[in-house]
Amino acid sequence: MADGTCSFCGEPTVYFFPGGLCVSCTSKNARIRMQEQPTQSRELSAFDASVGVMQAATRRTEIAAEKIQKNKRVVGTSVREFDAAHPIALTPEGQRAALALGLVHYKTSDTRASTTGTVTIEIDPLQARAQRLRKSVITGARLHDQEAKKGSFRGAWYFLTLTYRDGSDSSPRDVSELFKRMRGHFNRLKSGRARWNRESFRYVWVGELTQRFRPHYHVMLWVPQGMFFGKVDQRGWWPHGSSQIEKARNCVGYLAKYASKFTAITAAAFPKGFRTHGCGGLNTESKRELRWWKAPKDAREALGGEADIRKAKGGWFDRLTGEFWPSPWKVTFIFGRTFAWKVVQL
């Protein structure tokens, strides 16, 4: 192209505009011919692709962190403090839905700051199951030992260990069938001796898992003086494996040791449908005391030490007086997780 000509149309001109265009081509928004760019090498293309993958992974991590922060639970703190640290913008419909779930503080008719809020905790069902087991087993063993000493019963505590042999099938009813046969043997012997009239078939047991995740049971059994049970596997009462029985020195400490081994991990791995513990033979007063200790601390304080506490919808009540204690805690299930919350004063 000769000098003094338009770079697009090739017509001679005196005035040039950006891109070497004449007045006519500039006014018509003429397309500027661009120089061809060199082809990008394979190494550079691979580098760009890796950078893109890294950026995408970083963004996914940021999104996951944002979700975790958004769903972070409030433990032991007021909702006002949580909202101040993690403000969330909600629509009016969203605010009503969150209010119904107890996840935000309740507003009063006054336009000033609210004086109430909620405390929310997450409940681990497996951990709660392990805690109930420890409380039931240790308290039941203590009450049995107190009854035996208070009533001046003659006898001794024996430890019975039950295991399954390799290849043997296990069933949730195996332990129940064993105690059914042992109780029948106990009652037959009791009916033939007058000195055993006041005796009861007392036992407390707790489950455990072996290294192969097979159930394994430890039983504390009260044997009156002169009564004989023998080995339950040789009598055919436990045909699933072997048994071992020996005299005990510290019945409460023995069961407390095995109850403390039962954790949330054990509860998760325990076969479905199998019971994990049991207690039998307590008198009426000891049963009432066991239920009292298994009730929440707030219910025990509200209803008193002599109450026969029973569970009712929305709280607990004393069966002796009919007094009802409404629980301040409400339970909500969100995406398979269990949350308990209550309204508190800020």
UniProtKB/Swiss-Prot annotation:
Q: List the disulfide bonds.
A: none
Looking up InterPro entries in the UniProt record yields:
ORF2/G2P_dom (IPR056906)
Keywords of this protein's UniProt record, alphabetized? DNA replication, DNA-binding, Endonuclease, Hydrolase, Ligase, Nuclease
| Annotated GO biological process | DNA replication
Report the domain of life of the source organism.
Answer: Viruses
- Please report a single Pfam family linked to this protein: REP_ORF2-G2P
| Family the UniProt entry places it in | Belongs to the inovirus G2P protein family.
Role played: Isoform G2P plays an essential role in viral DNA replication. Binds the origin of replication and cleaves the dsDNA replicative form I (RFI) and becomes covalently bound to it via phosphotyrosine bond, generating the dsDNA replicative form II (RFII). In turn, viral DNA replication initiates at the 3'-OH of the cleavage site. After one round of rolling circle synthesis, protein G2P is linked to the newly synthesized ssDNA and joins the ends of the displaced strand to generate a circular single-stranded molecule ready to be packed into a virion. Isoform G10P protein binds to double-stranded DNA and prevents hydrolysis by nucleases. Additionally, G10P is an inhibitor of DNA replication and may have a role in the transition from semiconservative replicative form DNA replication to single-stranded DNA synthesis in the life cycle.
Q: What is this protein called?
A: Replication-associated protein G2P
Recorded name of the encoding gene: II
